[in-house]
């Protein structure tokens, strides 16, 4: 399990994730990089779920980005279509948040593509904790950037969620 959170503030979008990989009730690795840049460093993605499945989906999404010249929504919708229709892909257990400098989306395990109503998206076992923390920080008077809000939200989720750690990777577009 994991925590991935994405925040948009002041024209910037930041995605961050923890680095813990578990197998059952055991921590297998604490330095998994679940947030990565794609398509000429203009798109960032973060994944939760089965690590192998997430890598497959990330690679497929990257191919869609290349095919559609970096168009985020078109690439996500095409990935979702393939995810729903391709028998082998339907068994993959993962979710992704994908973002560029102007939009971000949740691509769910059932092949849904969801654009958030608010400036926060979060997935994984610690996702609800991170989302609540990020929303609270966005609603209060402060000078925190999107990246700083992501960092704080990940810390709070890590304090609560036993499947998330403090080894964070945060990218901003």
Swiss-Prot record:
Pfam families: Proteasome. It comes from the Bacteria. Protease subunit of a proteasome-like degradation complex believed to be a general protein degrading machinery. It comes from Mannheimia haemolytica. SUPFAM superfamilies: N-terminal nucleophile aminohydrolases (Ntn hydrolases). Na(+) binds at residues 158, 161, 164. Its main location: cytoplasm. This is ATP-dependent protease subunit HslV.
């Amino acid at each position: 399990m994991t925590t991935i959170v994405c925040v948009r503030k002041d024209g910037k979008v930041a995605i961050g994730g923890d680095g813990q990989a578990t197998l059952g009730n055991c921590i297998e690795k604490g330095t998994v990089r679940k947030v990565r840049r794609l398509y000429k460093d203009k798109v960032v993605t973060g994944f939760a779920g089965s690590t192998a499945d997430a890598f497959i989906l990330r690679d497929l999404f990257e191919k869609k980005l290349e095919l559609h010249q970096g168009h985020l929504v078109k690439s996500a919708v095409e990935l979702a279509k393939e995810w729903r229709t391709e028998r082998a892909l339907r068994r993959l257990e993962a979710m992704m948040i994908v973002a560029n400098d102007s939009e971000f989306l949740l691509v769910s395990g059932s092949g849904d593509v969801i654009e958030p109503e608010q400036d926060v998206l979060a997935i994984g076992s610690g996702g609800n904790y991170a989302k609540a923390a990020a929303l609270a920080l966005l609603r209060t008077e402060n000078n925190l950037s999107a990246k700083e809000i992501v960092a704080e939200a990940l810390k709070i989720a890590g304090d609560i969620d036993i499947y998330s750690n403090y080894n964070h990777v945060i990218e901003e577009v």
